[in-house]
């Protein structure tokens, strides 16, 4: 881990043929959050196992385990088959995506679900960063996985809106990290289901420049 930053243990957080008699899956609210928790968990498992052990077809061997994780997360029985298909699809997509593989590969000071504490507006806050590491150019990356659904319209417009939505949250992560180390920081929102992302430099946000 980077100097002065202490990681904390995180809590346990594409082949789909829909059956005509299967109830529609509720992607709103809690269902999305619960599915996202399981996707995060499996991305951490893959990363910590080592990417070289995870060709995309290996995901099929863990169907039952993914199902158990979804049940534990609160996905109901009638939504389970669809939930399993969506989690597996997200993992397939990530493992087939060059950016996804780069995120999950080994890096300097790499960590998953990395806990940090800092202060904001006079309050102590605690955050968990989905994935962070230092790349070959000495840049610290702070990456947040997102399971947001994209329904119609331009994917690029959707990603631009998502960046605007989460920019302040990501800036908060960068502020805490900046208090621990002085190096360039880049921020990324990564969308496994879309094989797509948005990234930007933390120095684009006022007050987050680093000292050369």
Question: What annotation goes with each model-predicted range?
Answer:
Residues 142:
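Pre-DFG segment of protein kinase catalytic domains
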Residues 145-162:
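Short beta-strand-loop-alpha-helix junction that forms the active-site gateway
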Residues 196-212:
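Short, electropositive alpha-helical surface patch
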Residues 145-149, 191-193, 204:
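A short beta-strand motif that forms part of the nucleic acid-binding face
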Residues 1-139, 156, 166-175, 179, ...:
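Nuclease catalytic cores
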Residues 121, 150-153, 207-208:
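A short local loop/turn or secondary-structure capping micro-motif enriched for an aromatic residue
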Residues 55, 159-161, 206:
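Glycine-rich, phosphate-binding/catalytic loops in enzymes
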């Amino acid at each position: 881990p980077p100097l002065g930053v202490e990681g904390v243990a995180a809590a346990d957080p594409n082949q789909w043929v829909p059956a005509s008699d299967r109830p529609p899956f509720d992607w709103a609210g809690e269902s999305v959050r619960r599915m996202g928790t399981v996707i995060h968990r499996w991305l951490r498992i893959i990363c910590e196992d080592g990417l070289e052990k995870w060709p995309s077809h290996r995901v099929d061997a863990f169907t039952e385990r993914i199902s158990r994780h979804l049940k534990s997360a609160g996905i109901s029985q009638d939504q389970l088959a669809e939930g399993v298909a969506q989690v597996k699809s997200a993992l397939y997509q990530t493992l087939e995506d060059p950016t996804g593989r780069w995120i999950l590969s080994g890096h300097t000071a790499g960590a998953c679900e990395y806990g940090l504490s800092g202060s904001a507006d006079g309050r102590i806050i605690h955050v968990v960063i989905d994935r962070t590491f230092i790349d070959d150019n000495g840049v610290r990356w702070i990456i947040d996985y997102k399971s947001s659904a994209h329904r119609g319209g331009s994917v690029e417009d959707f990603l631009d809106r998502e960046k605007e939505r989460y920019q302040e949250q990501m800036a908060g992560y960068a502020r805490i990290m900046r208090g621990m180390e002085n190096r360039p920081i880049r921020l990324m929102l990564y969308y496994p289901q879309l094989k797509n992302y948005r990234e930007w430099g933390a120095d684009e946000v006022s007050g987050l420049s680093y000292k050369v």
